[in-house]
Design a protein with these regions (language model features):
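Hydrophobic alpha-helical transmembrane segments
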Residues: 1-151
Length: 151
């Protein structure tokens, strides 16, 4: 049963973090207080999925508690990743963002932009570490939830 739940939680994580995370939920990267509702709505999607999964194994009150736990942990982890003074300071720039910077500062060439904003480019090691730490925290949360469901 543990292997089935591991696969279910991988699918849950993918569906909730990618196809179901719409433009509104990406508002979690906005400054205070505008990020709060988008972040909580994204966490709620994770909580609803966990509630639905846990309801097959546990009483509804326990399933609800597990859903709220998942929502809370997911929201905090994503807040840490998105917060500009914590993980968000390592945000990576896409090619379009790079073009946007070049359009605002037309006197700079690509080399100058890279030297000024190099710590924010996709080659930024810390961006990938922050993203990896975020995913690790989510997976460890899933292991905890699976353990709680099966206990």
């Amino acid at each position: 049963m543990i292997w089935i739940l591991l696969v279910i939680y991988q699918l849950k994580h993918f569906i909730a973090d990618y196809p179901l995370q719409g433009r509104y939920m990406l508002g979690k990267f906005k400054p205070w207080p505008d990020f709060v509702l988008p972040l909580l709505s994204h966490g709620l999607v994770h909580g609803v999925f966990t509630f639905a999964i846990a309801a097959f194994f546990k009483p509804l009150s326990v399933a609800l508690a597990l859903g709220l736990l998942d929502m809370s942990i997911h929201s905090v982890v994503d807040w840490i990743k998105a917060n500009p003074s914590i993980g968000g300071r390592f945000a990576a720039l896409s090619k379009n963002e790079m073009k946007s910077i070049l359009s605002y500062v037309p006197t700079l060439g690509e080399t100058e932009v890279k030297s000024k904003f190099g710590d924010q480019l996709r080659s930024n090691t810390f961006f990938w570490w922050a993203l990896g730490a975020d995913q690790l925290a989510h997976h460890l949360t899933h292991y905890l939830l699976i353990w709680m469901i099966l206990s």
